């Protein structure tokens, strides 16, 4: 099994398959702090990250944005004082793809680095 945090996104087309229920169960175990949300029939991965202040939350948001640009896969980001909500899903397929789990794991790695600098 590939470690998600070390994987990279693959190009995704509109006809790419969503993760199956079994794949979802297997992949979510690798990112246990993430929740699966269903918004208007679209499954999404979501997690809230806590920080000591707005500046640290904003720096984390910038780091996630840079990662998203590098991978060509972009989340919804909500930055507030002391917290950032990150939501991953694949817009083209209106649901979850393996890429979303990769990016969630890589987001966790960024958060660990942010904690080290706190």
Swiss-Prot record:
GO molecular function, one term: 4-alpha-hydroxytetrahydrobiopterin dehydratase activity
SS bond list: none
EC number(s) reported in the record: 4.2.1.96
Catalytic reaction equation(s): (4aS,6R)-4a-hydroxy-L-erythro-5,6,7,8-tetrahydrobiopterin = (6R)-L-erythro-6,7-dihydrobiopterin + H2O
CDD domains: PCD_DCoH_subfamily_a
A biological-process GO annotation: tetrahydrobiopterin biosynthetic process
UniProt superkingdom: Bacteria
Keywords tagged on the record: Lyase
Entry-linked Pfam families: Pterin_4a
Family classification: Belongs to the pterin-4-alpha-carbinolamine dehydratase family.
NCBIfam families membership: PRK00823.1-1 (NF002016)
Protein name from the UniProt record: Putative pterin-4-alpha-carbinolamine dehydratase
């Amino acid at each position: 099994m590939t470690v998600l945090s070390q994987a990279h996104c693959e190009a995704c087309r509109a006809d790419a398959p969503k993760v199956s229920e079994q794949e979802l169960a297997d992949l979510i175990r690798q990112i246990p702090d993430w929740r699966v949300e269903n918004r208007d029939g679209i499954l999404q991965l979501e997690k809230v990250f806590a920080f000591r202040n707005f500046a640290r939350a904003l720096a984390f948001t910038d780091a996630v944005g840079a990662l998203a640009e590098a991978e060509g896969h972009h989340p919804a980001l909500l930055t507030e004082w002391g917290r950032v909500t990150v939501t991953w899903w694949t817009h083209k397929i209106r649901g979850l793809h393996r890429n979303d789990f990769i990016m969630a794991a890589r987001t966790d790695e960024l958060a660990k680095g942010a904690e080290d600098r706190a």
